[in-house]
Amino acid sequence: MNKISIIGSGFVGATTAYTLALSGIAKTIVLIDINKDKAEGDALDISHGVPFISPVELYAGDYSDVSGSDIIIITAGAAQKPGETRLDLVKRNTMIFKDIVAKLIKVNDTAIYLIVTNPVDILTYVTYKISGLPYGRVLGSGTVLDSARFRYLLSKHCNIDPRNIHGYIIGEHGDSELAAWSITNIAGIPIDNYCNLCGKACEKDFREEIFNNVVRAAYTIIEKKGATYYAVALAVRRIVEAIFRDENSILTVSSPLTGQYGVTNVALSLPSVVGRNGIVNILELPLSQEEIAAFRRSAEVIKSVIQELDI
């Protein structure tokens, strides 16, 4: 049936609905928001373009309408108030998620739950813990977008199609994330070797510049236009495609870890096999010892916040 429900019709939720409608992968898309008028307006606006794309039924609904959904995407959440700490915001969003997830589970406990709201790693773990859903059926957008930014910036440097660049940003979707430089390659050629071939410099300063631009990307965009939503909507579309097409594609989604690199009791991003039933497997990359240590530090950052939450 390929039915999707999107909880939250803000910038990210509405743009995700539009992007999914354009993709033609869903037969039904439901928009649900506390502001019903906003959801109805977005649904109408997108629906009026359906004659130009593949047929799709798109409408605003309520929690009862998530029944029969194959994927439930959650983009809803509170925005940070002036002077509010990150931890206070996390606590507020945790309370919001407890309410949302409880309502959703009553209606649909067979869907795959895809979390997009930030901080996505923490809220993915919160959803997993309070939903009682089987492992693999709760995942977050994680560093799928960060990895795309990484490949894009490398593609500009190397003048190569980003689809031919293989590299990952892993760990937290946030300031403690890390680039897995030790395995980054172009057509199987390690990035340092490729840079030598094309005459481009790939010294430490180059790596720092690329990585810092990845980490700072959202801040830069928010400073210029107030929010990010186009690229993340495309990242969500890519995850949805992998699920509906049962691709077993490798994407850096966020999910509860089960001992990878010695890490448990936290959700973080690692390259994961994604198919019809959600996460099939999490891959452990042959990282350097320095990268493994950085990944574990990223886990501790998230764990320290989770320990402050009532879940």
Curated annotation (Swiss-Prot):
Q: Which residues form the active site?
A: H173
Annotated positions binding beta-D-fructose 1,6-bisphosphate: R151, H166
Q: Which CDD domains match?
A: LDH_2
* Cited Pfam families: Ldh_1_C (PF02866), Ldh_1_N (PF00056)
Give me the residues that bind substrate, please: Q80, R86, N118, P119, V120, D121, D146, S147, A148, R149, T228
Give the Phosphotyrosine positions (modified residues): Y219
The known regulators of its activity are described as: Allosterically activated by fructose 1,6-bisphosphate (FBP).
Q: Which keywords belong to this entry?
A: Allosteric enzyme, Cytoplasm, NAD, Oxidoreductase, Phosphoprotein
According to its UniProt record, this protein's enzyme class is oxidoreductase
Instruction: Please give the GO cellular component terms listed in this UniProt entry.
Output: cytoplasm
Q: Where does NAD(+) bind?
A: V12, D33, K38, Y63, G77, A78, V116, T117, N118, S141
PANTHER family, alphabetized: L-2-HYDROXYCARBOXYLATE DEHYDROGENASE (NAD(P)(+)) (PTHR43128), L-LACTATE DEHYDROGENASE (PTHR43128:SF16)
The record describes its quaternary structure and partners as: Homotetramer.
Recorded protein name is: L-lactate dehydrogenase
Natural source organism: Thermoanaerobacter pseudethanolicus (strain ATCC 33223 / 39E) (Clostridium thermohydrosulfuricum)
